[in-house]
Amino acid sequence: MRSSKIQNSMMNVTDRAVRESNVKLIEAPSIALVVRSSILQHTFPVAQIDVDATFNQDMKALVVDSDRFEHRYIYYALSANGQEILRQTSKQGGSVNSLVVPRLMDFEIPVPALDEQQRIADLLDRFDALVNDISSGLPSEIAARRAQYEHYRDRLLSFPEKKA
């Protein structure tokens, strides 16, 4: 995945192919997760899917129940926890880096009330737009805004740990 938002594709699958094969159509909005790739050695790629899509075996889709969860919040929370997800779910051995999917599905992120999820996602969307709009500007300004974005993203997604 080269982008944090999937809004179109270079390749398309016909309705007939979906009907007559094992291809599964993932409805938007959802979240794409890379589960097998050499990039998993250092990065956990996650993207928001804004169009209906299909994937190969190297990716999984997380279909979000919009009555309970804001998909943008889930995307940001997974992105912010990427290194911890890799630490807890990476498969040892093998010729290509991969994640143990059941462990990935068991990974917990803090989930506040839906209106709070939406508020956090709206704030992070604004920071994200600011960083991307500035990308044609001065490199030092870009670096400062990215650092600010990461700081606020991590602060917004920090919650007290639950007592056992």
How would you describe each model-predicted region?
Residues 1-164:
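Charged, alpha-helix-forming regions
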